[in-house]
Regions:
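Catalytic-core "active-site belt" of small-molecule-metabolizing enzymes
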Residues: 1-61, 65, 69, 77-107
C-alpha cells in the first residue's frame, strides 16, 4: 500500500510537524473539503493497524530515518481533483492546509 502512493507528481504535503510536537495520534480526526464541501471525514482510529504497528512493520523492510514520510491510507471519499478546485485538509489539533489545484504536466 505504501509504494502505490509514491509516483511522480503525487502526494503534495503540508509543512512537516515534528512527532514530538504532535503528541498522541491515536484517535485524531482527519478531514478534507473540496470547494467547501466535505469529501472525506475520518479518524486515525479507523486504520486497520495503529501508527506504531505500521512503523514497526515498515522498519523491517526499510531503513526509516528522520524526515521520512509514510503514507497510510485515507478515509472514504477519494476522488479526482480538477485544476481550479480549492481544498482544505485538517489533521485535528496538528495542522490545517489549504490550497488550489493547478494545471501541471501530463503524466
Amino acid at each position: 500500500w505504501d509504494t502505490g502512493k509514491a509516483f511522480d507528481h503525487a502526494a503534495p504535503i503540508s509543512a512537516i510537524v515534528p512527532v514530538a510536537d504532535v503528541g498522541e495520534l491515536g484517535a485524531r480526526g482527519l478531514s478534507l473539503q473540496i470547494n467547501g464541501q466535505t469529501r472525506q471525514d475520518g479518524s486515525l482510529a479507523d486504520l486497520i493497524w495503529d501508527v506504531p504497528e505500521i512503523l514497526h512493520e515498515l522498519a523491517k523492510l526499510y531503513a526509516l530515518r528522520a524526515g521520512d514520510l509514510v503514507f497510510m491510507g485515507t478515509p472514504a471519499g477519494v476522488g479526482p481533483l480538477q485544476p481550479g478546485d480549492r481544498f482544505h485538509a485538517v489533521l485535528d489539533g496538528v495542522i490545517e492546509h489549504s490550497g488550489q489545484i493547478v494545471d501541471g504536466p501530463t503524466l
